[in-house]
């Protein structure tokens, strides 16, 4: 496993936390609507990827990144310090479910855990990062509800089955599904991921599909979405 990943404007050191840079994370970081946001919360920050992408995309925002795992928190803190935006990035080593913020957030971003109990395939921090028991969907959404502003947007990425379940739980907690993008690896395959936007305010609903690969490599839509981050994507 590579211990680092370099983007156009920042660098991710993975260290010993066992959380590699994933396509899921890059998709969410590029897709989430953080325009006109001044306060952004990154839940389960891991190496800090989503926070760094948000800082690059929105030069006016302050990003709070909350991470429970000590090793990951140290790695994210280092990545923030080495970035061009360290003054706007704050690492909070804390359990999200007991976190009390001094203000509401305009945007929340989260790549939630999705392994159900008994399905863990690995040990350690990477397994914890993907295990639903560490941050159950209902508790995650209930606490998001207390932290998000009345018109704020919360963005997530999940596999299709878990994403559909997540949306049902969200609606029970008074969230509106305001945007969804179904992600396919190729045109002929079924979607494998859902990019999900929720809000307590009923924004206009948007639905789309994103295909990552076409016959010649990466699709035009994928390149357009991620070209400001990936090297050699122009």
From Swiss-Prot:
Coiled coil feature spans: none
Protein's UniProt keywords contain Transferase: yes
PROSITE patterns reported in the protein's UniProt record: N6_MTASE
UniProt cross-references to InterPro entries, sorted A to Z: DNA_methylase_N6_adenine_CS, SAM-dependent_MTases_sf, Small_mtfrase_dom, tRNA_Adenine-N(6)_MTase, tRNA_adenine-N6_MeTrfase
Reaction catalysed by this enzyme: adenosine(37) in tRNA1(Val) + S-adenosyl-L-methionine = N(6)-methyladenosine(37) in tRNA1(Val) + S-adenosyl-L-homocysteine + H(+)
Keyword check for Calcium: no
GO cellular component: cytoplasm
Top-level enzyme category: transferase
EC numbers, comma separated: 2.1.1.223
PANTHER family recorded: TRNA1(VAL) (ADENINE(37)-N6)-METHYLTRANSFERASE (PTHR47739:SF1)
Protein known as: tRNA1(Val) (adenine(37)-N6)-methyltransferase
Native species: Aliivibrio fischeri (strain ATCC 700601 / ES114)
